[in-house]
A protein has these predicted regions:
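Domain-length cofactor-binding catalytic modules of enzymes
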Residues: 1-199
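Aromatic pocket-lining residues of Rossmann-like dinucleotide-binding sites
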Residues: 220
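Conserved glycine-rich cofactor-binding loop
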Residues: 209-210
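N-terminal Rossmann-fold NAD(P) dinucleotide-binding loop
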Residues: 213-214
Length: 221
């Protein structure tokens, strides 16, 4: 079941900064949280883990979403004596899940790489699915993480549509890899302009209701 808005807020306040640190050990990432009805219907469904493990099918999405998300099987009512304990349980599940995801992604790269393949990219998940909470998408900027979230929303709709008529099938692993690590895509990444000084940073400006603080916010956004 979906948590109340107050409970979701409590979880995210406690978990989100910690999780950002975990996924940002190689390069800092910025998160976008989505917990709308469609996302919650998916992550709370009995088929969510099976479908998410199969991966996405749209070639244009692989650079953002990777071949698959990290799905965390968390039930705050299952074992914990209190909600605070449930949040700590979630942290343990996330830490274990991230470690396994990174290992699996490295094996996927080694299994599928070709002599001309670009080097292994950042191997943490860019989409994290948590029952009761929704989706946390990651990117190098807020706008990129929002795009990642929208791409995975599209993937969910494809899965939902496929499951209504038959069974969802993702692209074969090698084909997915060849798209994700396509040399033309790598060339586009290499041609991107250099990141600005505060890229990937989260900035808090105190006293920004008016005057200098407000003007500073407009200048750095």
């Amino acid at each position: 079941e979906a948590l109340s808005e107050e409970q979701k807020r409590e979880v995210l306040i406690e978990v989100l900064p910690w999780l950002r640190g975990k996924v940002s050990q190689e390069k800092r990432l910025i998160g976008t949280v989505q917990s709308g009805e469609r996302i919650l219907d998916f992550v709370n469904s009995v088929d969510a883990e099976r479908l998410s493990e199969l991966g996405t099918s749209c070639p244009d999405h692989f650079l953002r979403t990777k071949i698959k998300p990290l799905f965390v099987e968390w039930n705050p009512q299952a074992k914990a004596d209190s909600f605070a304990d449930a949040i700590e349980d979630l942290k343990v599940l996330l830490a274990d899940g991230l470690e396994q995801y990174v290992a699996d992604y490295g094996e996927y790269y080694e299994r599928c790489k070709r002599p001309t393949s670009p080097a292994l990219r950042q191997s943490v998940p860019t989409v994290v699915l948590i029952p009761g909470i929704g989706m946390i998408a990651w990117g190098k900027s807020k706008s990129e993480s929002r795009v990642t979230a929208e791409f995975y929303n599209c993937a969910i709709e494809v899965m939902r549509g496929a499951e209504t008529v038959n069974r969802y099938r993702a692209l074969p692993e090698q084909e997915a890899f060849d798209i994700e690590y396509w040399l033309m895509e790598e060339a586009k990444l290499m041609r991107m302009p250099p990141e600005q000084a505060l890229a990937r940073q989260v900035v808090v400006v105190i006293g920004a209701g008016n005057g200098i603080g407000k003007e500073l916010c407009h200048r750095i956004c």
